[in-house]
Amino acid sequence: MKTQIQELRTQALADIESAGDAKAIDELNIRYLGRKGLVNDLMKGMAKVPADEKPLIGRLANELKNDLQDAFAKAVEKFGSGKEAGDVVDVTLPGRPRKVGGLHPLTTINLEICDIFTRLGFDIAQGPEVELDYYNFEALNFPKDHPARDMQDTFFVSDNVVLRTHTSPMQVRTMEKQKPPVRVIAPGKVYRCDSDITHTPMFAQVEGLVVDKGISFADLKGVLTTLVHQIFDDKTPLRFRPSFFPFTEPSAEVDIGCVMCKGSGCRVCSHTGWLEILGSGMVHPRVFEFVGYDTSEISGFAFGMGVERIAMLKYGIDDIRKYYENDLRFLNQF
């Protein structure tokens, strides 16, 4: 073992002496002092050395390692580091810009809608996405046999717990805690068993509620007209078309002039010149009864819209699924 140490020392020092550049020194350093180098291999042989020789051999091995480290240090001073020599930085090259994230288009639209309503004096309410059947259906005047309660349309967690199908439950929860006047919007995620180019199982919705004395359909039209003109432009035509919702009476769908063909008729609007964007109506008296409001003194209106629907119309997107595919080629356009 003593002879091996001496031979390794002689060979290593000779190799260091004959090295001609920093790269060769780096390679020799790895060969002799690396984790799998010759010195470490020699150290592993200490287990076979007789006990009475171990102190001497151990001292010689450590001296070898220290001597080689000193020799390599002097060689690096002479030639410099191979790594430093190879990694020359050209400071005249342009830098690589850092990738910076941005707001998702749905987030942008959602914030824009919320900003419009807060400037109109609305509060923002948040609530649970896993909701009781009572708040999601019963308190909103959905009969027990209403199609929306079917498994085809609703994700049931248990017999009386669902993933909310709209954010309307927050209207009921708000009225339970607050006496009129009420002016609130409820943005959030909702869930329905539906998936195609215009529907996803999870989507974003914003619903609103106004309750006070003397509230009329004219107030509803004024608020929603302001919303449409703020999101699109003040020349965008809109109409209120009679419809039905269990929690409003009368009810109306709100259509705007087709943003694709400007009302002349195209495939997107089924050649009608109009596109549906949201539902609305005067709050049904039975909804007020569930929260203990006196229907002889107050009235109110409610409305709801899908954020994806608004974004599709504003940006001219024909497939709702593009918003959720995380394709940067698409998202970077916004």
Swiss-Prot record:
Q: Which reaction does it catalyse?
A: tRNA(Phe) + L-phenylalanine + ATP = L-phenylalanyl-tRNA(Phe) + AMP + diphosphate + H(+)
Q: What class of enzyme is it?
A: ligase
Q: Can you supply one Gene Ontology CC term for this chain's record?
A: cytoplasm
PROSITE patterns in the record: AA_TRNA_LIGASE_II
Where does the protein end up?
A: Cytoplasm
UniProt binding sites for Mg(2+): 249
A Gene Ontology biological process term: phenylalanyl-tRNA aminoacylation
UniProt KW DNA damage keyword:
no
- Cofactor stoichiometry and binding remark: Binds 2 magnesium ions per tetramer.
Q: What is its main location?
A: cytoplasm
What are the UniProt keywords, alphabetically? Aminoacyl-tRNA synthetase, ATP-binding, Cytoplasm, Ligase, Magnesium, Metal-binding, Nucleotide-binding, Protein biosynthesis
Instruction: Please give the superkingdom of this protein's source.
Output: Bacteria
Any one Gene Ontology molecular-function term assigned to this protein's record: phenylalanine-tRNA ligase activity
Q: Which InterPro entries match?
A: aa-tRNA-synth_II, aa-tRNA-synth_II/BPL/LPL, Phe-tRNA-synth_IIc_asu, Phe-tRNA_ligase_II_N, Phe_tRNA_ligase_alpha1_bac, Phenylalanyl-tRNA_Synthase, tRNA-bd_arm
**Assembly and interactions?**
Tetramer of two alpha and two beta subunits.
Write out the similarity annotation: Belongs to the class-II aminoacyl-tRNA synthetase family. Phe-tRNA synthetase alpha subunit type 1 subfamily.
Against NCBIfam families, the record matches this protein to: pheS
- Name of the featured protein: Phenylalanine--tRNA ligase alpha subunit
The organism's taxonomy opens as:
Bacteria, Pseudomonadati, Thermodesulfobacteriota, Desulfobacteria, Desulfobacterales
What gene, per UniProt, encodes this protein?
pheS
